Amino acid sequence: MAREFSRTRRIAQQLQQELAQVLQRDIKDPRIGMVTVNDVEVSRDLSYAKVFVTFFEEDSKLVEEKLEALTTASGYVRSLVAGRMKLRVMPELRFVYDASLVEGMRMSNLVTRIIHDDEAKQQKHNGKDKTDTADSEGEE
């Protein structure tokens, strides 16, 4: 059982590398553009592979169009990858948009903005305290 799991994991890793190369070098469809293969999950019987991809665009309409183009080209991509990998059964490819990278960038930007706002408030507060202490010293 553990051996089967490690085999599917190894196949998924190799499939991820081969897919990345094929999508980068061999697919010339302008609708797809720059695509990154983040992860691949292969079913236990190797009949399906879920391919998690990201694009440089964040617009949901463009992402849908690119996913549709990838889905249309999946048979061709599958045949190219099958030529590179020596598997008895080449998994059927299902492309899924991986929003984790975009979500991570959004969260990072939020944290950066909050830190910046907090520092600005702290500086404003420290500047106000210095003025108050200067005023109280002048009254004595």
From Swiss-Prot:
UniProt GO BP: maturation of SSU-rRNA
Residue ranges the record marks as coiled coil: none
Extract the Pfam families matched here: RBFA (PF02033)
Mostly located where? cytoplasm
PROSITE patterns in the cross-refs: RBFA (PS01319)
Region spans: Disordered? 118-140
Q: What SUPFAM superfamilies does this protein map onto?
A: Ribosome-binding factor A, RbfA (SSF89919)
Location in or out of the cell: Cytoplasm
Can you list the GO cellular component terms from the UniProt entry? Answer: cytosol
What keywords tag this UniProt record?
Cytoplasm, Ribosome biogenesis
Q: Which InterPro entries match?
A: KH_dom-like_a/b, RbfA, RbfA_dom_sf, Ribosome-bd_factorA_CS
* Molecular function GO terms recorded: ribosomal small subunit binding
Comp. bias intervals (Basic and acidic residues): 118-133
**Would you identify the family this protein belongs to, as annotated?**
Belongs to the RbfA family.
**HAMAP family membership:** RbfA
What the protein does comes down to: One of several proteins that assist in the late maturation steps of the functional core of the 30S ribosomal subunit. Associates with free 30S ribosomal subunits (but not with 30S subunits that are part of 70S ribosomes or polysomes). Required for efficient processing of 16S rRNA. May interact with the 5'-terminal helix region of 16S rRNA.
Assembly information from the UniProt record: Monomer. Binds 30S ribosomal subunits, but not 50S ribosomal subunits or 70S ribosomes.
Q: What protein does this entry describe?
A: Ribosome-binding factor A
- Natural source organism: Shewanella woodyi (strain ATCC 51908 / MS32)
In the UniProt record, the gene name given for this protein reads rbfA
